[in-house]
Regions:
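Acidic/histidine-rich helix-loop elements
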Residues: 19-28, 153-155
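A short alpha/beta connector and helix-capping loop motif
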Residues: 23-51
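Active-site-adjacent betaalpha module
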Residues: 1-8, 36-40, 44-45, 62-189
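N-terminal nucleotide-binding beta1-loop-alpha1 segment
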Residues: 9-14
Length: 189
């Protein structure tokens, strides 16, 4: 992994509503702590940090736009006043937002993706990022997945969901990295 230029750090949908039992079991309980490590390094270097905030239109969702607590960012990684937040109501951080034009205006060539959840916003945004021509890095231990039940009523563990989503993104859509690898590389530069 060789990170070119300073990539924009994308922090996707790390909101209190994802702590609701509605989502089921989750993997990577340390994801928010890893995001905080990356945020701290990006802030120290004054690099581009961009958040997305999901405002669901589904009334039963803990992320429904009327659920004021559910849509709030988790305190551990809450944006600072000068950091940009793009609000959205679909899985992709690029749809219905100015994310792409903002990145192009800032001449950002690469992005480092973190956030929740691996099978929703993270995967969808990583795919779109690559398709739009951005060099895309996905921090596998700074993202997390939730268990799902498939069409045959089989429950798939969050670990398996995460593993398969990461595998599907690997090489074709994103370079998969870990928090420690990113931080080590930055210290060497």
């Amino acid at each position: 992994m060789k990170i070119i230029n300073p990539p924009a750090l994308l922090v996707l949908d790390v909101q209190k509503g994802f702590d609701d039992p509605f989502w089921g079991k989750r993997n990577n309980p340390q994801a928010e702590e890893n995001i905080l490590l990356l945020l701290t390094e990006w802030r120290k270097r004054d690099w581009e940090i961009i958040y997305s905030q999901h405002l669901s239109l589904l009334p039963h969702s803990p992320l429904h736009y009327k659920n004021k607590t559910g849509v709030e960012f988790k305190e551990i990684i809450a944006p600072l006043p000068q950091e940009i937040v793009f609000q959205k109501n679909v899985n992709s951080a690029f749809i219905g937002t100015e994310l792409e034009s903002h990145l192009r205006e800032k001449q950002v060539q690469s992005v480092l993706i973190t956030g929740l959840s691996t099978q929703h916003c993270v995967s969808t945004s990583a795919r779109m990022s690559a398709n739009l021509g951005f060099e895309t890095f996905l921090v596998e231990d700074a993202t997390a997945a939730y268990e799902i039940t498939d069409h045959t009523n089989t429950t798939i563990t969050p670990e398996d969901v995460h593993k398969h989503e990461i595998a599907a993104l690997h090489k074709e859509f994103a370079t998969i990295v870990k928090t420690d690898d990113v931080l080590t590389q930055l210290k060497q530069s």
